[in-house]
Amino acid sequence: MDTSRVQPIKLARVTKVLGRTGSQGQCTQVRVEFMDDTSRSIIRNVKGPVREGDVLTLLESEREARRLR
């Protein structure tokens, strides 16, 4: 692992559950708002149970999921 450009771990709160995704519906697409910068929100895919108000630990905060169709 290249430790020269390691991003800090970010905390994000789930603001809206958008729907299920994946070939068998195993992931949930959610909109998250960063705890340190509340004006910034992105869409992520989450594996496992999740609901609005949950706090996620994002190891990689720049990647955004594609929207559901």
Curated annotation (Swiss-Prot):
It is linked to Diamond-Blackfan anemia 15, with mandibulofacial dysostosis: A form of Diamond-Blackfan anemia, a congenital non-regenerative hypoplastic anemia that usually presents early in infancy. Diamond-Blackfan anemia is characterized by a moderate to severe macrocytic anemia, erythroblastopenia, and an increased risk of malignancy. 30 to 40% of Diamond-Blackfan anemia patients present with short stature and congenital anomalies, the most frequent being craniofacial (Pierre-Robin syndrome and cleft palate), thumb and urogenital anomalies. Belongs to the eukaryotic ribosomal protein eS28 family. It is found in: Cytoplasm, Cytosol; Cytoplasm; Rough endoplasmic reticulum; Nucleus, Nucleolus. The keyword Endoplasmic reticulum applies. This is Small ribosomal subunit protein eS28. GO terms for molecular function: RNA binding; structural constituent of ribosome. Pfam families: Ribosomal_S28e. The modification N-acetylmethionine is found at M1. It comes from the Eukaryota. GO terms for biological process: cytoplasmic translation; maturation of SSU-rRNA; ribosomal small subunit assembly; ribosomal small subunit biogenesis; ribosome biogenesis; rRNA processing; translation. GO terms for cellular component: cytoplasm; cytoplasmic side of rough endoplasmic reticulum membrane; cytosol; cytosolic small ribosomal subunit; extracellular exosome; nucleolus; nucleoplasm; ribosome. Component of the 40S small ribosomal subunit. Part of the small subunit (SSU) processome, composed of more than 70 proteins and the RNA chaperone small nucleolar RNA (snoRNA) U3. Keywords: Acetylation, Cytoplasm, Diamond-Blackfan anemia, Endoplasmic reticulum, Nucleus, Phosphoprotein, Ribonucleoprotein, Ribosomal protein. Signal peptide: none annotated. CDD domains: S1_S28E. The keyword Iron-sulfur does not apply. The modification Phosphoserine is found at S41. InterPro entries: NA-bd_OB-fold, Ribosomal_eS28, Ribosomal_eS28_CS. Component of the small ribosomal subunit. The ribosome is a large ribonucleoprotein complex responsible for the synthesis of proteins in the cell. Part of the small subunit (SSU) processome, first precursor of the small eukaryotic ribosomal subunit. During the assembly of the SSU processome in the nucleolus, many ribosome biogenesis factors, an RNA chaperone and ribosomal proteins associate with the nascent pre-rRNA and work in concert to generate RNA folding, modifications, rearrangements and cleavage as well as targeted degradation of pre-ribosomal RNA by the RNA exosome. Its main location: cytoplasm.
